[in-house]
Structure formats: C-alpha cells, structure tokens
Regions:
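C-terminal "exit" segments of structured domains
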Residues: 39-44, 260-341
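VWA/integrin I-like adhesion module and closely mimicked acidic/polar interface patches used
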Residues: 200-249
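Acidic, polar low-complexity linker/tail segments
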Residues: 38-90, 95-104
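Von Willebrand factor
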Residues: 84-191, 193-197, 203, 227-239
Length: 341
C-alpha cells in the first residue's frame, strides 16, 4: 500500500485553499505485480468498472453476476478478476484559449491544480505520459522520460503566463488529438487509457467520434475525462453531451464539470469540507482508471468491430441497488489496433 499526501501550489489568491484541498486529496493505490499483456485473440480481457448508487466501486462480484448477450462476439464469461497488468495513462491537457474561463476567473489555476494532482498519483503499477494540445498536439512528455520530467514540465506550465494559448477560433480539436494520443501507446492493450482534461468543446475535428471509437476497439483502450466549465451559468455555453457519450462508449468515466467557483478551490470556511468531498470523488475516479477489474471473455472469430452487450444479472442488480457498469461498448478484431500513423 502506498500512502501519498500531495500539495499543489497554484498561482493566485487561492493558494491557501488549493494547499488545503490537495493536502486532503491523498489516494492509496495497491502495489501489485504486473500481469502479461493481451495476447490471445480468443480470450479477450474486457476492462469493467461497476459502481453502486453512491458511486463507490464494487469489487465483490463474480463472473456469475454478469450476462453477455452477443451472438456475433460470443456468450462465455470465463472469469472476473482484479486487473493486475501495468496501466499506462496518456494525459491529454487542453491548453486552448477557452480553458482560461471568464474574464477575472481563476479557471486555469483550477485546471493546473487538477492535472498536477493526477500526475502525482503514485502506484508501482502505473506509468504516465503527457500531451499538450489545442487544434493539434503541441508537445509531449513520453513514458520513457519518466514521472519526474512530466511533473517538472507541468510546474513550468503553471508558472508560464503564455498558457493557456489564445487562438484565432476553432482551436480545440479533441477527436483529432485523441487519434494522435493513441499513437503514444506502443502495443496498446485494454490496460491502457487516455485521460483528457478539457472543457469538452470540440471545434472542427476532421476525425469523427465513431472513427476514434473504432480505433480504440481493437485494444479496448478506454478514454476518461476531467471536465472543467469555462462558462458557468452562461446560456451560450456549448453542449458537451456528445463528448460525454463518447467517453462512456469507450468504457471510461467523466469527472466534473468543475468550475472556478467550486468551493473546494476557494479560500473560505467551506473549503475543508468541500475538499474532503472532492477527495473521495477523485479517489473513486482514479481507481476506475488504475484499479479496474477485467472480465475474461471467450470471443468468436470476428471480422469487424462488434457491439458488446454486457449487463448484470437481476440478482446482482437487486443486491447493489441502482448500480452502474462501465465497459467498452465495442470490441474490435486483434488487427484493428492500427498503430500506424
């Protein structure tokens, strides 16, 4: 067990509130030996997260609690286990102008506090890389450079007044960038994830969401998102519904949206309580990325990506009361990983 207490020091008047928040945002992750990567096309490892009505991750299920109804894919659920493989996470940080928020707000400080907190998650079973993007990937810190290099670059960005980048419009192309992000994962597997920190507003990507989902389907890479709200209360704010649905179809989850007025990020009497609430929520979110379970399923020979129809049995649903289940909604052929540029 690793116990970590982190203190992130953003720039601005909220420094003391941020310090308080990230002192309580400690996350303990199990140190677990690595498992072999996916290598058998007949037996596929489907990453699954089940939560109860309060959003807490459920780990007490067995393979008998799941029902897989797919004639095209197969119907055999072989086992349900903790995912002991090494988890690689590519953090995709949106640095486009909209991440600045409303005039006078401190949204960018919130963004940097969140991404620095993510980068500080400690586990012997995880690796992190970073990509900064607007309408394209601007720069990267890859896995080989290590966690220290990643955290150092984030610290530099937090102090650099040229961030976020102010563009000329149509400067946030999330789906184009996600396609590039997959290429940072050499020999990807279903233990790998993309974590996007963004406002969720795509502007003119040439790549369609379903094209990205098709690219993810072979290795079953999941996409997670930390959403921030740059225009809280504004009627003209764009709809993020399409992006949220995309994340969920990939098998991932969404945290937020968080805005600059969130009590956890303000220097007020309510900061401590709000920080504790956010600590618990972030802890569950991270565990969905790094401590998921896997269903080993027997897969028939498939020639193209197929929908996955997975559900809990009636008895399991009754026992858990309003559970939610997160898993990749599409499974591709072994040859559909498409790591070529």
């Amino acid at each position: 067990m690793i116990n970590s207490n982190w203190s992130v020091l953003p720039v601005g008047n909220e420094k003391s509130a941020f310090k308080l928040l990230f002192f309580v945002l400690g996350l303990s992750l199990l140190c677990r030996p690595a498992m072999p990567q996916d290598g058998n096309c007949e037996k596929r490892l489907l990453p699954v997260v089940v939560t109860d009505k309060d959003g807490n991750r459920v780990t007490t299920l067995t393979s008998a609690d799941f029902r897989l109804d797919n004639r095209e894919v197969g119907t055999n659920v072989l086992s349900w286990n903790a995912d002991l493989r090494r988890h690689r996470v590519v953090i995709l940080l949106d640095v486009s102008g909209s991440m600045h928020g409303l005039p006078g707000s401190h949204l960018w400080n919130v963004v940097m506090a969140l991404v620095q907190h993510v980068a500080s998650v400690e586990s012997d079973n995880s690796e992190f890389a970073l990509a900064l993007f607007t309408d394209r990937v601007l720069e990267t810190v890859d896995f080989a450079q290590g966690r220290d290099a990643l955290k150092k670059r984030l610290d530099e960005i937090s102090r650099d007044p040229t961030f976020p980048r102010i563009g000329k419009g149509h400067d946030t192309k999330i789906y184009d960038v996600l396609r590039e992000g997959v290429h940072m994962l050499e020999n990807p597997t279903s233990a790998d994830s993309l974590l996007v920190i963004t406002d969720g507003f795509d502007e003119g990507s040439k790549t369609r969401p379903d094209e990205v989902l098709g690219q993810l389907a072979g290795p079953m890479i999941r996409v997670f998102a930390v959403l921030v709200d740059p225009l809280p209360g504004e009627r003209s704010r764009p709809d993020t519904g399409e992006f949220v649905r995309f994340v969920q179809k990939s098998g991932g989850q969404v945290f937020g949206p968080v805005d600059a007025g969130n009590a956890a990020f303000r220097d007020s009497a309510k900061s401590a309580q709000a920080g504790q609430v956010m600590a618990g929520q972030l802890g569950q979110f991270y565990r969905g990325i790094l401590e998921n379970n896997v269903l080993t399923i027997q897969v028939s020979a498939i020639q193209k990506p197929q929908a996955v129809r997975l559900s809990l049995t009636d008895s399991a649903r009754h026992q858990l009361k309003k559970p939610q289940i997160f898993f990749p909604r599409e499974i591709g052929t072994c040859l559909s990983t498409d790591t070529s540029r």
